[in-house]
Swiss-Prot record:
Annotated ranges, domain tr-type G: 5-187
Single GO MF descriptor: GTP binding
Keyword Protein biosynthesis: yes
EC number: 3.6.5.n1
Lineage: Bacteria, Pseudomonadati, Pseudomonadota, Alphaproteobacteria, Rickettsiales
Family matches, as InterPro entries: EF-4, EFG_III/V, EFG_V-like, EFTu-like_2, G_TR_CS, LepA_C_sf, LepA_CTD, LepA_IV
Protein name: Elongation factor 4
Gene symbol of the encoding locus: lepA
Length: 600
């Protein structure tokens, strides 16, 4: 392997749909990573969902060999990163493994909210940034205006920006030359003792866990005994290699390189992302600074529509967990829905993708309960609790105070839609922190409660701005709030699966909306059915499903009135008994429709 000065480790960062994965395809094609017949669109997006939705979920890596104009061969390690806010953690891991970044901006759309978030992360990691303006072939492309926008908002020098069209392949050689000439090589190795950063891990059915590493010092070779510093686990390396993007086995990974190894590790949970890997015999003294753990922020219950599918759901979740350590689940039961799982996600897109993968890859039909967030409860007896399931909320008399999570949201929107976006944020209990204009776009920063975001905020933001607004958020603080548990009763029976924790000011509106929706969904019976929304013992909304009238006199043609009276009295007694003991069956379809996110 050549000297470190011929290695370049870089990641591609951009907002969704600005052309990251297409640019990665062109770079692979240009450097001969795959033959023309093996190329497909979005080579690095391996999941079907990634290709269909046009998003990157898992960060992917590939090593390219490029012969530069100076006559030398350079080894380029490319990390393709996700652009969606839910997967910002994947971005932070990729950035920590690299020295430079390609910032891709769509020259027809300009700077978006997620572009900003990723750029600031790259700057925090001391990255050298090469600006790439994409989609130059489109008639709406305005490179000069976008350059000015970038200088105004981010403050990066745009005089050496590379203008390309990733789709048609224009300017790809300029990007490669910029990578070689402007991005720095890895720092010289300061020691021969192995020190490597664990960047990612995933499960392979034949090899066990495959671990992606960035070697900082020393080298990693086959049959070495290595130690994970966070867990002190010791393993023997079985295979070492890199991706081109095909898997390529080699003998050794040197300092500065990015590659993978396998070591007969059974579970992804044993490999903590951000951990330091070192030699068991000669361990390094100090571990690398890792990443802050990625904690789930949105929770919901997943239940099989058929209880016989429970074991299949359990196995399916375990398989998904092998490749997605940020996804958490635990068993729970509900009187209405049976046995299922309480699951934790990074955000709503993450929730949707897990749901879609369960139905598509494992053929499961699921009911999803209303999403909730983690609340902090301070009890009168001094105990502090963290809950995310409304069923776990203690009696309000025992609670001293409750805190809910708030987020800091950055929204970029064309100024003609600003009014609609501001009124949406105000409706969601938002507080405006900042408001500025860049050309004809407004950048607003709001503080918003997370439990208002998880319902339908993103969908409504897109619809009130005709799809032009972009949105990025990060957790901010927990603040005291007047929260209540909104319960739904059907025929005086509490339906636990429909319970939610809401702000007192929104309780009546949401309770009424749920009652109205259930009235349309639950089939009529022979008795009146009361659907009620309650806070504790107080009813705040009610709808009634009127009874079906069964005509018991239809077979009485004339005859004695006492005969008719006897039949009517019998029906009356039956209805009384039904009201007393009858359970109202709520069909699964009613649950699914009532719990639909975004139909508020």
């Amino acid at each position: 392997m050549n000297h470190q000065k011929y290695i370049r480790n870089f990641s591609i960062i951009a907002h969704i749909d600005h052309g990251k994965s297409t640019l990665a395809d062109r770079l692979i094609e240009h450097c001969g990573g795959l033959q023309a017949r093996e190329m497909s669109q979005q080579v690095l997006d391996s999941m079907d969902i990634e290709k269909e939705r046009g998003i990157t979920i898992k960060a992917q890596t590939v090593r390219l060999v490029y012969k530069a104009k100076d006559g030398n061969n350079y080894y380029l390690n490319l990390m393709d990163t996700p652009g969606h806010v839910d997967f910002a953690y994947e971005v932070s891991r990729s950035l920590a493994a690299c020295e430079g970044s390609l910032l891709v901006v769509d020259s027809t759309q300009g700077v978006e909210a997620q572009t900003l978030a990723n750029v600031y992360q790259a700057i925090e990691n001391d990255h050298e940034i090469v600006l790439v303006l994409n989609k130059l072939d489109l008639p709406a492309s305005e490179p000069e205006q976008v350059k000015q926008q970038i200088e105004d908002i981010i403050g990066i020098d745009t005089s050496e920006a590379v203008l390309i069209s990733a789709k048609s392949g224009i300017g790809i050689d300029l990007v490669l030359e910029a990578i070689v000439n402007k991005l720095p090589p890895p720092k010289e190795s300061s020691s021969d003792i192995l020190k490597a950063l664990l960047v990612d891990s995933w499960y392979d059915p034949y090899l066990g866990v495959v671990i992606l590493v960035r070697v900082i010092d020393g080298y990693l070779r086959k049959n070495m005994r290595i130690k994970m510093m966070a867990t002190n686990s010791v393993y023997t390396v079985e295979n070492v290699g890199y991706f081109t993007p095909k898997k390529h086995i080699s003998d050794v990974l040197h300092a500065g390189e990015i590659g993978f190894f396998t070591a007969a590790i059974k579970q992804v949970a044993d490999c903590k992302v951000g951990d330091t890997i070192t030699d068991e015999k000669k361990p390094c003294e100090q571990a690398l600074p890792g990443f802050k753990p990625n904690l789930p922020v949105v929770f919901c219950g997943l239940y099989p529509t058929d209880s016989s599918e429970f074991e299949h759901l359990k196995d399916s979740l375990a398989k998904l967990r092998l490749n997605d350590a940020s996804f958490e689940y635990e068993m729970e039961s509900s009187s209405a829905l049976g046995v299922g799982f309480r699951c934790g996600f990074l955000g709503l897109l993450h929730l949707e993708i897990i749901q879609e993968r369960l139905s598509r890859e494992f053929d499961l039909d699921l009911i999803t309960t209303a999403p909730s967030v983690v609340y902090k409860i301070h009890m009168r007896d001094g105990e502090n609790l963290e809950i995310h399931n409304p069923a776990d909320l203690p009696d309000l008399q025992k609670i001293e105070s409750m805190e809910e999570p708030w987020i800091k949201a950055t929204i970029m929107v064309p100024d003609e839609f600003l009014g609609a976006v501001l009124s949406l944020c105000t409706e969601k209990r938002g507080m405006q922190l900042d408001h500025s204009y860049i050309a004809n776009r407004a950048k607003i920063i709001y503080k918003l409660p997370l439990n208002e975001i998880v319902y339908d905020f993103y969908d409504r933001l897109k619809s009130c701005s005709k799809g032009y607004a972009s949105f990025e958020w990060q957790m901010d603080v927990y603040e005291p709030s007047e929260l209540v548990k909104l319960g739904i009763l059907v025929n005086a029976e509490v339906v636990d699966a429909l319970s939610t924790i809401v702000h007192r000011s929104r309780a009546e509106q949401r309770g009424r909306a749920l009652c109205v929706r259930l009235k349309d969904l639950i089939p009529r019976q022979q008795i009146d059915i009361a659907i009620q929304a309650s806070i504790g013992s107080r009813i705040i909304a009610r709808e009634t499903i009127k009874a079906l009238r069964k005509d018991v006199l239809s077979k009485c043609y004339g005859g004695d009135i006492s005969r008719k009276r006897k039949l009517l009295e019998k029906q009356k007694a039956g209805k009384k008994r039904m009201r007393q003991y009858g359970n109202i069956e709520i069909p699964q379809s009613a649950f699914i429709a009532a719990l639909k996110i975004g139909d508020e």
